[in-house]
Amino acid sequence: MRSKLGTHFKKASVISGSVTQSKVNQSTFSRSIIGTSSRKSLNLHAESKMGERNLSMVSKQSIKIFDDDGKDVSPQPLFQAEPGTVPQKQNKLFTPPDASGIGASDIFSSISLQHTAFNASFVGPFTRSTFGASTVSRSSKETESMTEDIEETGFKREIASLSEIQGKQHEMQPTEEDLDKIINIFLTDTETLWLLDMPPALTATDSENADLVRVRNQAYEDLCKDKVGNDKYIERMMQTFSGAPKNKEVQCDRIILEDTGVMASVWDLYDSYLSPESLPMKEAVDRAIETKNISSSRLSESRGTQSMNSLGRGDSFSSSIADIERLALTRIPDEVEPDSEEILKSEKFLQDLFFMERVVVENTFQSRLAAYRQLPVIADPDEDEDKISAMPSNIVSPSLNRLWSFACDVTKGHNVSSMSWNKKNSDLLAVGYGQFGFAEQKGGMACCWSLKNIMWPERIFHCECGVTAVDFSAVHPNLLAVGMYNGTVAIYNVQNNEDFPVLDSSDNPNKHTSPVWQLKWIEHDRGNLGDDKGEILVSVCADGRITRWHIRKGLDCNDLMKLKRTGSGKSKKSSNEKERKGEAFISRQAPGMCFDFLPKDSNIYLAGTEEGHIHKCSCSYNEQFLDTYRGHKGPVYKIVWSPFCPDVFLSCSADWCIHLWQQDVLLPILTFSNTTNAVYDIMWSPSSALMFGAVSENRVEIWDLGVSIIDPVIVNEANPGVKLTSILFAKNTDCVLIGDSD
């Protein structure tokens, strides 16, 4: 029986400056211990990419590698010896030039150190114990054949000496030139790695939703448990069909593109650049003086410590400061005291005053303006709380509370004759000022008031005589028609602040010769007047004519109707027959006092006369009246069609009465009389079909036919010595405007 002990060891050497790593591979050493003859075999195999020769044994040398900065970057050994083991010695085995000096003790010591590795890599498959404790179960022939195969593989390679390897190591060390070479490193994109990230939704245990989250989590866990082995839940595959897209054609407005350009010259850029840098004279001079003081202090310090060269630099610095000061003084103009008259007359100052005045007025009258517009009132912090608490909280009966008065020093003492709202801007009010009596005539005016400034009118148009009627155009809201006591009809443009009309009838041969008591813009859209479609101006005058005005090169007119006097129907003869005949001949035409067109048919209108009659007329026929409504005993001052019921109208007269008429009935349906004074003006409410307002000489009456047809629901007495003249309801609010003689 022959036993063999095989030992396998492996060593690695690192060569500086070379990318190739040499490996001293497996060597097998077999020796028989029992028997007369012994056999020694040691194979050393070396594998290299460069085709290096085999080595018997290479002594392990510690080689250090340093980088360009002098740092030690030598690789650390992969094998860590167990504590207590003896360091391995370098052996030179069976190499012709280096074979001297090798003893048997060196060989056996190296064999014993690598015995563990040998058992693990080579003998491991053939034994169960370590350090040769077990015998090989294979036959000696199989073992010898395996050893011969290993030896044949090793002898096929050439054997290289250790001195040659050391020489190669020395030759492959980098030189200074190699270290100074520039190495190009190319960076390329690597493949993108997608990592699934599903952030969890965490909820604090002490939050408000913690209980709800716990319940949902528990329900989900129960559902997952119930699904396993439950017949209620089955897996089923489905396919979702998405609808096929459809192409549709649509139309849109043409997209209009416009190109705009602005040219800026060099001087514009220069001025714009310097404008924020312009400073007042005092600030610039202070900066120049401060700079000069700093320069003088620096110059004094430099003279005490530096040479003549430094003095020269200080002199140049001070001279440059002087140049800067002269430049600042030349660039900054002399301060000129502004002229107060120029400031007061400047447009910018007037515009600033205009806006500032509006802001102050709106802040002062905020509560009243809010009540007018039916908005919540902001409490004044400076107002006494006792006064607020003393105000009644609930008002049982309806009443009128005064908000403010459109009055100023210019309008003080003038009689309000007419009022009209602008058709487009409901905040703009036109008021005419003039006297009604012939002996009381004086200069009149027409003013345009705005709710944004109730203390002063926006426009003031002075007239030679008193203004008796005003009205805004609906088609052209900037045109204001004004009728005067001397029969003149004028048209003003409220967009301009000029105090003269753009058109008037003073040069027209067919102008009115008596006071124009009413005028109104009428829209004719039914084509009954031929070429005169659109908006026309109609006026009624005390000379007995109802006239239509056209705006062409000037104001041209033609008569719609001449109001003729009508008898009472009874002819009585008396001794004064000649006197009555003469009177009838002189006053053949009845003075016109008012008119109003039918809302549903602009070709039909009513005209009130000084006789007390109301005539129904047509624009297509001017020879005679269509109908005559008799009921008043005095001059008819106002006629108003109902905005809700087109066949009903109201009329007021100097006979203290207000009549309610129906178009098909020639006698009044209702008569309202609650005063002993003449009723000057009436108007329907724009918000209620049964409510209207009336103004007599000393009181304002608000009637509600749904409450009472005998007495008005609201009565407000005028101040002593003040006569009320006109009434006008405000639009979109529960307010009414009253004109008086003050």
From Swiss-Prot:
GO cellular component: axonemal dynein complex; dynein axonemal particle; motile cilium
Pfam families the UniProt entry points to: WD40
Gene Ontology molecular function: any one: dynein heavy chain binding
Major localization listed first in the record, in broad terms: cytoplasm
Xref: SMART domains: WD40
Domain of life according to the entry: Eukaryota
GO BP annotation list: cilium movement
Subunit and partners: Part of the multisubunit axonemal dynein complex formed at least of two heavy chains and a number of intermediate and light chains. Associated with axonemal dynein subunits such as, DNAH2, DNAI3, and DYNLT1.
UniProt xrefs under InterPro entries: Dynein_IC, WD40/YVTN_repeat-like_dom_sf, WD40_repeat_dom_sf, WD40_rpt
Protein name: Dynein axonemal intermediate chain 4
Subcellular location: Cytoplasm, Cytoskeleton, Flagellum axoneme; Cytoplasm, Cytoskeleton, Cilium axoneme; Dynein axonemal particle
Keywords per UniProt: Cell projection, Cilium, Cytoplasm, Cytoskeleton, Flagellum, Repeat, WD repeat
WD repeat spans: 462-502, 511-559, 631-671, 674-713
Functional note: Plays a critical role in the assembly of axonemal dynein complex, thereby playing a role in ciliary motility.
Origin species: Xenopus laevis
